[in-house]
A protein has these predicted regions:
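Sec/Tat-exported extracytoplasmic proteins
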Residues: 68-73, 112, 116, 159-172
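Short linear motifs at secondary-structure transitions and domain/linker junctions
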Residues: 17-22, 53-60, 80-89, 102-103, ...
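Short secondary-structure transition/capping segments
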Residues: 6, 11, 30, 119-132, ...
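A structural "domain/chain start" motif
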Residues: 2-63, 69-70, 170-177
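C-terminal/domain-edge helix-coil "capping" segments
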Residues: 136, 140-177
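Surface-exposed short loop/turn segments
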Residues: 72-125, 129-147, 154
């Protein structure tokens, strides 16, 4: 008896939720049409950073964005320009002025451009920070820093994709189309 009641209750709740989602205009990000189609039509350009590590972080951001949204066709209607920035900050200094922890921050300043007209459609900045304990020895710090840059850049790229999806699902993007 109780099972039958729970089954009816779950079916009723499922129908109510489905109706509410259909009524609110909810569109899944990866569905056909909508933001997913627009994300697949973006040509990505990486602007040079001011340092080698900026460029390394930019490379990881670029690779992650391409992995997530794919590579664009030759006639892409949009161009995404990304300018990377890397910062490492020492934390937890010992009495010998040696850091025991580091924070790595990767920032991606981006601009979405209409490829035909050159008009700037949207711009933003995404940032992520990763902390790591400093291993003993200089090579351990270098290795940990390299891994930290890659992890932080991937997280930054994921946030950038969310910002782009938010733009393409907005009324502002629909007015441009």
């Amino acid at each position: 008896m109780m099972r039958k009641y729970l089954k009816q209750l779950s079916l009723t709740l499922s129908l109510i939720i489905a109706g509410a989602l259909a009524g609110c205009g909810f569109t899944p990000l990866h569905s056909t049409g909508g933001a997913a189609t627009s994300l697949a039509d973006i040509d990505i350009a990486l602007n040079k950073g001011s340092s080698v590590v900026d460029n390394q972080a930019g490379f990881f951001v670029l690779q992650r964005v391409r992995d997530r949204i794919g590579t664009a066709s030759d006639a892409s209607p949009y161009r995404l320009e990304i300018t990377p920035r890397y910062r490492r900050r020492r934390l937890g200094l010992t009495s010998g002025d040696v850091a025991s922890r580091y924070d790595i921050t990767v920032t991606a300043n981006w601009t979405l451009v209409d490829a035909k007209t050159g008009k700037k459609l949207e711009r933003g900045s995404t940032e992520s920070t990763v902390s790591f304990g400093a291993p003993d020895g200089p090579f351990g710090v270098i290795t940990a820093d390299n891994v930290g840059v890659e992890q932080t850049a991937k997280e930054t790229a994921d946030k950038l994709i969310i910002d782009l999806a938010r733009y393409f699902s907005s009324d502002k993007a629909q007015a441009v189309k």
